[in-house]
Amino acid sequence: MIDEVDMIQSESNYRPSLESLIDHYFEFPPKNRCLVTATMREFSNPQLQQECKFNLSWKDAPKRKIQLYYTDNLDALTSQQIQFLPPTEKIVIVYNSIRHCRNIIKLLPDEHLKDCAILCSDSSVEEAGTYYAELAEGNKLPKRINFITSCYFAGVDIEDYYHLITVSNARQ
C-alpha cells in the first residue's frame, strides 16, 4: 500500500527516489497492492490509469469548528490566537515561512519560548536555529507550540491531539 500517492505525482520531479516506488508497486499482483490518497488526480502513467478506483465517503463526517480571520498583520494575529488557547493543549501552526514563524515566536511572552518548535526540512536547520525540531517518537509533537513548514504538509501523520492554526499569506 502506498499512502499519499498524490505526493508522488507532485514531487516526483524533484524527488527521483519516489519514481522507483511506483516500479516496486507494479512488482506486486493487482490484488496485493493499492494506492491511497485524499486528493485524487489523474495519473500521467498509463499503467496507473488502468488501476481500479474506489471512492470512499464519510457516513457521518466529523464536525469541525473553523474560524476564519482576515488581517493586515498575520504574525501579530497568529501570536494572539496562540495565547487564547488553553495553556496545557498542543498547537500546530502551519506557515510556510521560517522567518515569519520566528517572528511570531518573538511576539509571544517569554515564558512560551521554551515551548516552541519549528518543524522544517533539514536544509533549513540553520534558519530555524534553536527552535528546529522533528516529530518525537510515535509521530508525536515535540513541544506545545509547533510551527510546521511545507515538508510536513503531505505524507506525514501526526499522532497527537492539537489545535490547528493555518496561515495563508497572499503576499508571499
Task: Identify the residue ranges that each predicted region occupies.
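Conserved two-lobed SF2 helicase motor
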Residues: M1, K140-G155
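SF2 helicase catalytic motif II
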Residues: M1-F28
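Residues immediately C-terminal
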Residues: M7-S10, R41, A154
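Loop/turn-to-beta-strand initiation segments
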Residues: F28-L35, P142-N146
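Interdomain hinge/linker at the junction between the two RecA-like core domains of SF2 helicases
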Residues: N32, A38-L85
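Conserved strand-helix element at the start of the C-terminal RecA-like helicase core
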Residues: Q81-P109
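Conserved helicase motor
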Residues: S97-I98, A117-Y132, T149-F153
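Conserved RecA-like helicase motor core of SF1/SF2 enzymes
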Residues: S150-Q172
